Each structure stands twice: as structure tokens, then as C-alpha cells.
Amino acid sequence: MIHFAIPALLFAHLTIAQVIIIAEPKTNVTILSPKSICTFDTPAEGVKLDRKELDAAVGELKGSITDLQFGALSAALSHSKIKDKKEAAMFMAHIWHNSAGLKEKRELYCMVDLERCKEPYKGVLPGRVYYGRGYMSLATEGNYREASQALFKDDRLLKNPELVAEDECISWRVAIFFWERNVQDAAKSGKFGETTKRVNSAECASGDKAANDIARRRFGYYKVFLKAFGVKEEEAKEEGCY
């Protein structure tokens, strides 16, 4: 991967709320804010999201998405293996559910009582607790190591697991890494339930109405994103989970 020096002067007039997006095919650098710079070593051949379409879906779900979130999501998806809006809608439905509408990027149980999470989520490095972080909740030392090596060819996420929650670009890249590694082949079936089974198989337990109702809620989100992305409603296949 090529590293680029970003002139400090470029950020001199910016506040953290402001966003600059630079689509630069030759350098694969997207500048989101002074604290979030996306770099990629893969070509931009993934799906392109339309802001108005995404806003329509998020609005129908009575939520919102910030410029920073959209910029990072757009950059990460464009460099992903997600090629069409049907799969993007599946991805966004699970993200919406797992992050409580793009609001939560840390495992709430551990935020309330970190001490109880230290033992199950401990690692080799002292002081690090590898509980669930990010839009797809990356958890355990092994998964942090695997994601870090796959995305950056180093151990930065092991050394600083908080990056998965704090850096918007990394949050989305880790979520897409999880999707491509664990869910994407199921998404190709076109059956949304198959993707739910990969994301959280417990929701597909036979005869467990409460769990199945959560899975149905995910499917409801999928239909909202699918409609907003301009995909025909009959494309929404529910089967594969309960």
C-alpha cells in the first residue's frame, strides 16, 4: 500500500463536523475529516450508493445518517466486493439492526459493565479488551487480528481496538470485511433469511417466536432499503431463516 502525506494546511479551516470527500482513482484516498482518512489498495469497482436514496430509506425508518457516515460508507462500498444494490440493501438492513439505527458501535453490555467483559474478551496485549465494536460488532482477539491483517497488513486493531468504533472509515471497512468473509456467499442466493442465519443464527431457531420476530424485523428493514434503492419489491425473498 502506498502511503500519502496529507498537507496540514488542507485541514486548517475545517471543523470536525465538516467533510471533504476526494475521489482520487490513482491514489485511492478519501479524506472524510481531519480525523478520518480512508486509503485503499483495491480498485473502486463496488456498488455506488446515491445519497438521496439512502436518505429516503433512513428517513422512512425515522433515523438519520451524517455526512461523515455517508462519506465513509460510500468510500468503503465502492472499494468492496458488493456489486449491486440488492446486496447493498441486505447489508444495510443488518447494519441498521445491529447498530440500533447507526447509533451504536460498542457492545452495550460492556459499556455498562466493562469489568465483566475483561475476562471473556481479554487478549495477549495488556489492557486491551476485545469486546464487540463497529457496525457489525467485531469481537474476540482472533477476529481483531484477522481483520487487521486483512485490511491493513499489520496489527493496528490489536494494539488499538477502539479504532473499530472511533474511526468511521475503519468501522465501515470492518463491517464489509465481516460481510465478505461470512455472509456474501449466502447473499448470492437472494434469500434474506440465509444472510440472517450467518449474521445471528440464534434468531433462526425453530419454534422460538421471540427470536424469529427479531429476524422478521431485519427483513422489514431490508424491504425499506430495497424499495429506496429502486429494486422491485418482488425481489425481496424472506425464506432461509425461520
Predicted regions and their residues:
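Acidic helix/loop microenvironments that form the catalytic cleft of cell-wall polysaccharide enzymes
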Residues: 95-98, 187-210
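Sec/Tat-exported extracytoplasmic proteins
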Residues: 58-62, 74-81, 95-99, 139-142, ...
